[in-house]
Amino acid sequence: MSSGLRAADFPRWKRHISEQLRRRDRLQRQAFEEIILQYNKLLEKSDLHSVLAQKLQAEKHDVPNRHEISPGHDGTWNDNQLQEMAQLRIKHQEELTELHKKRGELAQLVIDLNNQMQRKDREMQMNEAKIAECLQTISDLETECLDLRTKLCDLERANQTLKDEYDALQITFTALEGKLRKTTEENQELVTRWMAEKAQEANRLNAENEKDSRRRQARLQKELAEAAKEPLPVEQDDDIEVIVDETSDHTEETSPVRAISRAATKRLSQPAGGLLDSITNIFGRRSVSSFPVPQDNVDTHPGSGKEVRVPATALCVFDAHDGEVNAVQFSPGSRLLATGGMDRRVKLWEVFGEKCEFKGSLSGSNAGITSIEFDSAGSYLLAASNDFASRIWTVDDYRLRHTLTGHSGKVLSAKFLLDNARIVSGSHDRTLKLWDLRSKVCIKTVFAGSSCNDIVCTEQCVMSGHFDKKIRFWDIRSESIVREMELLGKITALDLNPERTELLSCSRDDLLKVIDLRTNAIKQTFSAPGFKCGSDWTRVVFSPDGSYVAAGSAEGSLYIWSVLTGKVEKVLSKQHSSSINAVAWSPSGSHVVSVDKGCKAVLWAQY
C-alpha cells in the first residue's frame, strides 16, 4: 500500500484494528517494558562474557606459546599467573553458568509471558465479541424502547381520548337519566290520566248502553203488552215453545204434542204480565253473551272428521308485505288468512277458490310483527311485535283493542290460553309474562334465563322454546318449571298436535322432533338432505289431523313429512326465492300457506 495514503483513507475495519493494536501496546508495554530492558542488559552481559571468554581462550593458547618462546623466564611468576588465570576462569565460568541459568529463567519467563499474552489476546477477542453482541443488544433494546415509548405515547393519547369521551358520555348519561326520570314521571302521570279517562269513557259507554237497553226493553214491553191483549192462537211452531223446554221436567218422558198442548194451556191460563216477563227473560238471556262463538268453529275433538290433503300445486303467489314476512295464520274457520311482516302491519286475506283477496290491514304496531294467533272464535287477533309489545285487534272492524307493554326486549311470540281471557308472551328479554285481558294488566312475570323464541299452551301448562337449546314446561299456577328438555340446537318453533299429546319442535341443527308429552321422550325425528333451518324464528306446523308436519327451508323449499312413516312426503319448490320463515295449514286441511324473507306468500293445495 502506498505510504502517501492517510489514515482516513484506510477502511474503517483497518483503522479499528490499528487502534486496538495501539491500545493493546499501551496496556501491555508498561507491564513488560522493565523485563525486556533487563533481558536486553543480560543479553549484553552475555555477549560481553562471550567476548571475554574468547579472549581468555586466546590467551590460554598464547601462554604455552610464550613459554615455548621464552623458556628462561621465572617459573614462580608463571605459576602465580596460571593460578590467577585459573581462578579468573573459574569465576568467569561460574558467572557464565549463572548467566545461562538466568537466561533460561528469562527465556521461560518470556515463554510464559507469551502464553499469557496469547490467553489475554483470546480473552480480549472474546470480550470484544461480547462487547459487539452487547452493543447490538443495546441497539436493539434502544430501538424497542423507542417503539415502546411511541406506543406508550399513543396509548396515553388514546386513553386520554377515551377518558374525555367517557366524561362526555357520563355527563350525557346523567342528563339523559334526569330526562328519563322526568319522562317516566310524566308517562306515569299520563298513563294515570289515560286510565282515568278510559274508565270515564267506559262508564259513559256503559251508561249509554244501559239507556239503549232500557229503551229497547221498554219498547219491547210496550209492543208485547199490546200484542198480549189480542187472542193468541195455538200453533205448533210457536216460539213460546222455548218456555216449555225451560220449565218442563226433563226427567219426564213427554211427546212433542203433549209439550205443545201443555205450553198452550199454560200460555192461555197465564196472565199477560207473566207472559211478558217470560219473553223478556228469554231475550235478556240471549243478549248476555258478548263473545258469540260461531257454530262452525266449535270442535270438541280437534282434528277429527277433517280430510287433510297433502298440497302439490301453488294456487296463488302474491306479495303479502313491503319487506320480510315473519308470520302467517289461518282463522279457525279457514276463511281468513292473516300475515305479519316487517312493515309493521298485519294483513287479512280472504281465501276462496284459488285466490287470496286482500280484505284489510291492522295497524298500530311500531315495529315488525313476529307472531300471529286468532282466538278460538276467530273474533280477535293477537300479534307480537319487535317494539316490545303485543296487541289485540277485533277482526270484524279492524280496530286495535289492547296494547300489552312491559317487556324490555322484542316480543317473539304471544299466544291465547284456552280460556281466551289470558295471554302468554315470550320475549328476547328472557322473560315470560301472563296477561289478564279482563283487568288488562300483567299478572305474572317469570324469568326463563334465555331468550324465548316460541310458545304453545295447554290447559295448565305453557311450553316455551329458547335460545339456549332448551324446551321449558311451565305450570301456570305455580310459576315454576315443571321440567325442561335440552336439544342439540337453538329452538326456533313449537307446535302441538290436535290431541295436545305431542309437541313438535324445530331447532337450528336442522332437525324436527316430535316429543310425547305423556312420556317426556322424543318420539320421532324428521330431517332431509336439503332441509336447512333458515333463521332463529323459522316456524313449523302440524297438519289439522296430526298426520303430517310442514316446515320451510333456507333455500326456499317447503318440506312435508309423514308422521306415520317418518319420511318426506312432498317437497314443494320453485316458488320462493329466499328462506321460508313460517308455514300455516288451514283447519279444514285443504290449504297450506308459506311466507318468506322476501315479500312473497304462496297458497298451496292438492289440485
Curated annotation (Swiss-Prot):
Motif window: Caspase cleavage: 296-299
WD repeat placement: 320-359, 364-403, 406-445, 447-484, 486-525, 532-573, 575-607
Subcellular compartments: Cytoplasm; Preautophagosomal structure membrane; Endosome membrane; Lysosome membrane
The record's account of how the chain is modified after translation: Proteolytic cleavage by activated CASP3 leads to degradation and may regulate autophagy upon cellular stress and apoptotic stimuli.
Outcome of substituting residue 540 to A: Impairs interaction with PPP1CA
Coiled-coil annotated spans: 78-230
Residue segments, region RB1CC1-binding: 230-242
SMART domains in UniProt: WD40
GO terms for cellular component: Atg12-Atg5-Atg16 complex; autophagosome; autophagosome membrane; axon; axoneme; cytosol; endolysosome membrane; glutamatergic synapse
Gene3D superfamilies: 1.20.5.170, YVTN repeat-like/Quinoprotein amine dehydrogenase (2.130.10.10)
Mutagenesis / variant outcome for changing residue 300 to A: Risk factor for IBD10; has no effect on the stability of the protein under normal conditions; enhances the cleavage and the degradation mediated by activated CASP3; results in reduced autophagy and defective clearance of intestinal pathogens; impairs interaction with TMEM59; slows TMEM59 intracellular trafficking; increases production of type I IFNs
Keyword Acyltransferase assigned: no
Main localization category: cytoplasm
GO BP annotations, alphabetical order: autophagosome assembly; axonal transport; C-terminal protein lipidation; corpus callosum development; defense response to virus; dendrite arborization; hippocampus development; macroautophagy
Record keyword Coiled coil present: yes
InterPro entries per UniProt: ATG16, Autophagy-rel_prot_16_dom, G-protein_beta_WD-40_rep, WD40/YVTN_repeat-like_dom_sf, WD40_repeat_CS, WD40_repeat_dom_sf, WD40_rpt
Region of interest called Interaction with ATG5, as start-end residue ranges on this chain: 13-43
Similarity field: Belongs to the WD repeat ATG16 family.
Protein known as: Autophagy-related protein 16-1
Native species: Homo sapiens
